[in-house]
């Protein structure tokens, strides 16, 4: 069992690495405006979009214009989506008669999908009509992912001293050249594997083996099951590729209609890893230094493999208390699908939280403490591949901090890619770094301090982790959750909405300001004393910076939550 599980993980990682140089090179060609095989088909369509939108693609933007374009376009997308969610009960394409959302739930849901988070305080199959799934969610899954991609590419350009580009062009090309073609192709593959794509309503299937239930002293013979279908294959592909994570069903990719078998599970893992891993290589191509890209990739890959190993060990060892009751050692199968098993569940959990996707093929609330620690660790760092576009930007921010600290140690003015790092750059990098812990820890403290707000279903260490995880997921724009939490309340809807907005747009504005400042700086000629960032040694320094600054910031939370729970489990206690 152990060998088979390890083999599954290794095979998936090998395929992931094999994709990186090809997809990374393709994305570099797209964002440099070079010719691709899609030009003949998509070129005229893109030009039509520019004309209809009044966009002049040859014009470049400064950082403030780019930021305003991001904020204005996202605000314009929010309004109709919010309206549809409120009124979906009165709108067409609602065969199951789903009523409109309450204003606080609609607000949270619209903001959640707008920010590429897809945190769901409702159950997918019973909370949203087909119209909402298509017009609201799938639309925002493309545009929010494209927004992140555009910001990430603009940041790379500024860091390298190039013009930031035009947001509307980057947004359009992200959708037309990257997200849309791949999503269509994989939607067809998922459709062939049994994922539904339909506008029909709920159907009723007769059970082959009826069973009896008893509730409140009443016995009932169950002979049929309701099956919900909808436009789900098209949603599933962009859900993973765009690092969105919002599910058509309440249990997300654990549902057999979203993720029917091990083959689709492999495809979904590769899809959610494809963009953030390949963007690191894209950075190397744009910097004319592929070695730099591979060093950064290797740095994050080593951290990722280590975290996968910890999560897999935790799931393979299982729960000591349960194993003691059974009298044998067994992997953890609580909250998991037997068609995937412990290895693929651990890998999926690590990948989905590392990439800020948020889709799940097992319930994170049921993970062992070690695997739960890994998922929370990923959300708190945001750089173990990271979000769509923003992930590479955060990695480069840690690179900037590492260069600054190294420069201080050797007594030189730090510089990166031929640009000096001065007070403004370090201040902006610090803001980007500090926003995350503040918007996680402050609302967590409020929720835990005021009786009745937290809504956690577990006492003790695990209950603390449930609350912290919800805010960390919102702040990181991930969207997964420890779903034992009672989060369908006005407090959770409104407080996480604020965290979602701050976690998305405050760093984006700061990233663009940092990129704009570096882009304006005069280049500094390279000398024999210039610190090289494309070496394995400096990759190790960057990894150390990530672990020291990122992990230690949240260590008290880790210690009071999953680490304490793990120690208690080893001692045979359940709290």
Swiss-Prot record:
The gene is kdpA. This is Potassium-transporting ATPase potassium-binding subunit. It is found in: Cell inner membrane. It comes from Gloeobacter violaceus (strain ATCC 29082 / PCC 7421). The chain crosses the membrane at residues 3-23, 69-89, 136-156, 178-198, 266-286, 293-313, 340-360, 367-387, 391-411, 431-451, 498-518, 543-563. One of its GO terms (cellular component) is plasma membrane. Keywords: Cell inner membrane, Cell membrane, Ion transport, Membrane, Potassium, Potassium transport, Transmembrane, Transmembrane helix, Transport. It is a multi-pass membrane protein. Belongs to the KdpA family. Part of the high-affinity ATP-driven potassium transport (or Kdp) system, which catalyzes the hydrolysis of ATP coupled with the electrogenic transport of potassium into the cytoplasm. This subunit binds the periplasmic potassium ions and delivers the ions to the membrane domain of KdpB through an intramembrane tunnel. The system is composed of three essential subunits: KdpA, KdpB and KdpC. GO terms for molecular function: P-type potassium transmembrane transporter activity; potassium ion binding. GO terms for biological process: potassium ion transmembrane transport.
